[in-house]
Amino acid sequence: MAEEMESSLEASFSSSGAVSGASGFLPPARSRIFKIIVIGDSNVGKTCLTYRFCAGRFPDRTEATIGVDFRERAVEIDGERIKIQLWDTAGQERFRKSMVQHYYRNVHAVVFVYDMTNMASFHSLPSWIEECKQHLLANDIPRILVGNKCDLRSAIQVPTDLAQKFADTHSMPLFETSAKNPNDNDHVEAIFMTLAHKLKSHKPLMLSQPPDNGIILKPEPKPAMTCWC
């Protein structure tokens, strides 16, 4: 696990390409890189969440992800520059088969996403957790549960207390947010910055033990959905 939790390193050059010091040129500063994968059914808003965090806005156009979508953003935490790489994979099985092994390689953290207006996407979460296990992701890799599209209040199907019980059962923090609503921009920021702080410090995201009366979900058939975000 120690090797898995070690971040990647990349050279970060100054505008002159190096830093001068008393003994001549010093080696270029290096930034840690953390790979975070974003998992969930198609149409739950994975791409829009990663775009909102990296670009600071909702994408002008949204289309179904085919294969893997990759974005990154540099942040500074306690004076250290860190790069966060967000890997968003297609939720549809036929688009995932050729990429799944590469997708799960050297992962530092996982974000599970469901659509708050679609109960089926919530019931699919156990299958996504199982996929992580099948690809040998250690249990102590940080995980976060995200309910997206909270702005569609009249259409919400997944109550917060149900999602919270599931999150507690799997020792994950729960965030409910909207990638589309600008008012929730700080909340989207908090999701990924929570992971960034955790990865930098290697401290647990949750210290409490999951309750004994946790719920267990079984996958249900996924209905057709029209929103590609």
UniProtKB/Swiss-Prot annotation:
Cofactor(s) recorded in Swiss-Prot or TrEMBL: Mg(2+)
Catalytic reaction annotation: GTP + H2O = GDP + phosphate + H(+)
InterPro entries, A to Z: P-loop_NTPase, Rab33A/B, Small_GTP-bd, Small_GTPase
Enzyme Commission number: 3.6.5.2
Location (main, coarse): Golgi
Residue positions bearing lipid (S-geranylgeranyl cysteine): 227, 229
Record's GO cellular component terms: endosome; Golgi apparatus; Golgi lumen; Golgi membrane; phagophore assembly site membrane; presynapse
Impact upon substituting residue 148 to K: In SMC2; strongly inhibits protein expression and may disrupt the Golgi apparatus structure
Disulfide bond residue pairs: none
Top EC category: hydrolase
Switch 1, short sequence motif: residues: 56-68
Any one biological process term the GO annotation gives: protein localization to Golgi apparatus
Residues given in the record as Mg(2+) binding sites: 47, 65, 88
Post-translational modifications reported in the UniProt record: Prenylated.
Outcome following mutation: residue 92 to A: No loss of SGSM2-stimulated GTPase activity
Family that this chain belongs to: Belongs to the small GTPase superfamily. Rab family.
Disease: Smith-McCort dysplasia 2: A rare autosomal recessive osteochondrodysplasia with skeletal features identical to those of Dyggve-Melchior-Clausen syndrome, but with normal intelligence and no microcephaly. It is characterized by short limbs and trunk with barrel-shaped chest. The radiographic phenotype includes platyspondyly, generalized abnormalities of the epiphyses and metaphyses, and a distinctive lacy appearance of the iliac crest.
Subunit organization: Interacts (GTP- and GDP-bound forms) with ATG16L1; the complex consists of a tetramer where two RAB33B molecules bind independently one molecule of the ATG16L1 homodimer; the interaction promotes ATG12-ATG5-ATG16L1 complex recruitment to phagophores. Interacts with ATG16L2; however interaction is approximately hundred times lower than for ATG16L1. Interacts with RIC1 (via C-terminus domain); the interaction is direct with a preference for RAB33B-GTP. Interacts with RGP1.
Domain comment (free text): Switch 1, switch 2 and the interswitch regions are characteristic of Rab GTPases and mediate the interactions with Rab downstream effectors. The switch regions undergo conformational changes upon nucleotide binding which drive interaction with specific sets of effector proteins. Although most effectors only bind GTP-bound Rab, ATG16L1 effector binds both GTP- and GDP-bound RAB33B.
Protein name: Ras-related protein Rab-33B
Origin organism lineage: Eukaryota, Metazoa, Chordata, Craniata, Vertebrata
Gene: RAB33B
